[in-house]
């Protein structure tokens, strides 16, 4: 407390009230509750008979004066006084003996919550859920948990004791009159410790950080007398401190909200001591009251003001007399009553047009703006007939006219033009692909490739080009769900939601909340390049997230706008040992919201991917250098002034919105140089605006100076420690979590143009300076300083449609920075899972405080933009293709490739087949009609994959035959179709050497990027489960090669083997080597038919044969069934000679 502290305002609480005839002495009654608002510059006072008033101060000729701002009744007068106040963003919560009242700061009632068991309430506090939930207790046996969002009681808890005070810090501390303080767990509300203060009766208690202070009274000669000391308890170590002496007899004790070891103690007569708990022998003493006695006492959240009330009803506000006082650090502006304009009288007459009345200005949807689906056709004009149709009508005797029948409609039918004129208020779901195909064969196909989804049609009368400014969430930001038919996810038309060449990510997979963040990482060129370079190395770590990011980036580039899925990446995240501990997984009971998980996941990914990169590059860690801010952390003890330092690495900056200085970059003289360069412009013109700029916030967050309490090795005790950073280097990729926690911070982001697309940094004299806008442009033009310019890559935004909808994150990315050639202008895109849409820069960088808030922002060094590295393709480590995973096995079904003779090259033909098991079955929901709807399709896992040579001397011989070690539970092995049994995939009983999924996947990924041509049957579904994206030019699917589109039916491998190759396969069960070998035989037969010009004719015969035999493979009369061996038998005399090809009856003209 400074020497200039004194009384700065005084006000009587009865001023402004009408006299109460039933209680003439009411004006002398003292307040029963007083508290500073934690969100606004208001002082709240509660009195008897349920009266609540808020007071606001203002300066009048330099003198601080108070006046009543608002007043209302929180409960009926007969229910007694107001006991306590709490505050949150919504309003003020006041506590009576029988109810909890919640009101807006303007006085409007939001909720009045009561219960039959609320008989004598005395105290309340917030729980572990922050300001959205409170715990209420009192001189009764029951405590209540109240959800402030739902405005209802959610839980009744037996009270361990009768409490009159509760405060929350790390724990909930509840004080009872008998001298004990119970320490409750804020989640379970169970007592974890009890502190006996040794007082016969407690009078007051306060909690801040790790300390509890209490004051009480002792029983002396039959009466209670205030104790001459303050009790102190250490919450961190759960032990008592020596009491603090206070000879004037303590009545109230408070902890200072800013100085963690400072306590303020006041006596009944008004003597006040400001004491340091660590050094209580030198208190600061003040006398705050004169001839009256103290009634109540409180300290403002900013620590700049104190309030005392006396027994005569006066409020005394203390603070520094030489400067302005603020109750809160960054408070909401006080809302005053708006003055209503005087409208001119309207001359109502028959000649006065009603449209001259006009409408007041409004920003929300009017009640009259009904959505289209609530409007009725009754009274609407009839449907319009086409005039040509009317002219062609024929007379029907003397009765009237009749119209000719038109193809596609019944007689006298026309199109209902009324329904066509109605606006569509939501996105129309596309048809399933199977439905489109069926309609196509009926001649009803409608081309939807050019259909533009109507985003402008929302139930709001406000017309704007910026969707983010609308009060209702536009369609393009809504959470889209995949609809499943009996054919599964493959039947969903993803192309309807994406007309760009950028691929979206499907969201029906566990942990798919990470899709937006994965998109942001993929569109950051430096991270993309390093991930692919690492994936091309020999890394086989099963938990390497960097490899998976590289595989995902490669898949999305090869997809060219087709839908992708991050199955393997998200599966590895689920199995990562650290992810569950950090509560980053879906289904975690103590996991936070998806917004908090996104911010935690960014920190987790950058940290662990940097470790992954270091495992294969033990020297210089390029990924750490590219993503980590290197600094020296200086820790200084405020007591002994000793200073220690330690190196620190930080991958993600958490933005801190505490007040910044007027010129955060002062010290490098750049701002002054810029001002001097502006001719004819006064220096005062460049003064910064009241709102801090993004660059100021970013600079302060990177340097982050803070004061905390910790152990000092010099003092050998816990002391206040000042911490600051000396920045050594900043990374090429700068990631930041927005950490928005208040309405003020949301409004800051919602300020137009607040987030710049470029920022610049200067590191000078152990400090970092950040610039944007005109200053940055001047620095770039000047070229005097070593300036690092960063471009905004994109951001992850949280969309909150409303209380009945689930919030979800989306990515907003400038794809121009990741193009190989720099485009002429920016290319902002919205990535809402599989819905991808180009948007304007204004749309991208406009935020809405009610439903669109940023979570993560990503900047990259501008010099690295558009540097897309492809050299990793020439540095692929292919050693795994030539390594035997089962060196000790005797009956191997494969023969490894010869590195010298059979190294895969672009155009090498290989045949592949995979077998799968069921990890999760369908999930259904029953609709109102009693019909089943699929809400989640079957989830398969790769069980076995086989790759066979399809060219060369050893054609038909497999070189990969891997059985997979599956981590998740298996629901069904599909033995009849997969040939896999439980003993094949159980590590304890399998006779095969089970390999990790990553090892099997990497072999296929290497073959893909070596340019091999994949031959198989039904490869689309195989590649989907494997999560491998193969370009069309590298796939020859025999299911598509032997398909006549007009026939609709696609033929099975067994039927084609019999009808084309005269081979019987899958006689007992499926075998992947046999199926892959059959596919490559069919492929070469197709090539033969195509080159000879007989393909079209033979396809007709194949379908005719199928119709005759029901499309099932049948034995040819007089021919024994043949079955290929696994591996296929090869003639030793003629290496690579296959079984002789015998044409079936249909190819012989039968």
Swiss-Prot record:
Binds 2 metal cations per subunit in the catalytic exonuclease domain. Residues 911-1079 form the Exonuclease domain. InterPro entries: Exonuclease_RNaseT/DNA_pol3, PAN2, PAN2-PAN3_catalytic_subunit, PAN2_N, PAN2_UCH_dom, Papain-like_cys_pep_sf, RNaseH-like_sf, RNaseH_sf. Residues 472-862 form the USP domain. GO terms for cellular component: P-body; PAN complex. WD repeats lie at residues 26-67, 114-156, 158-194, 290-328. It catalyses: Exonucleolytic cleavage of poly(A) to 5'-AMP. Its EC number is 3.1.13.4. A divalent metal cation binds at residues 913, 915, 1022, 1075. Gene3D superfamilies: Cysteine proteinases, Ribonuclease H-like superfamily/Ribonuclease H, YVTN repeat-like/Quinoprotein amine dehydrogenase. Positively regulated by the regulatory subunit PAN3. Its cofactor is a divalent metal cation. Residues 326-471 are annotated as: Linker. Pfam families: PAN2_N, RNase_T, UCH_1. GO terms for biological process: mRNA processing; nuclear-transcribed mRNA poly(A) tail shortening. It comes from the Eukaryota. Contains a pseudo-UCH domain. This ubiquitin C-terminal hydrolase (UCH)-like or ubiquitin specific protease (USP)-like domain is predicted to be catalytically inactive because it lacks the active site catalytic triad characteristic of thiol proteases, with residues at the equivalent structural positions that are incompatible with catalysis, and it cannot bind ubiquitin. It functions as a structural scaffold for intra- and intermolecular interactions in the complex. The linker, or PAN3 interaction domain (PID), between the WD40 repeats and the pseudo-UCH domain mediates interaction with PAN3. Belongs to the peptidase C19 family. PAN2 subfamily. This is PAN2-PAN3 deadenylation complex catalytic subunit PAN2. It comes from Pyricularia oryzae (strain 70-15 / ATCC MYA-4617 / FGSC 8958) (Rice blast fungus).
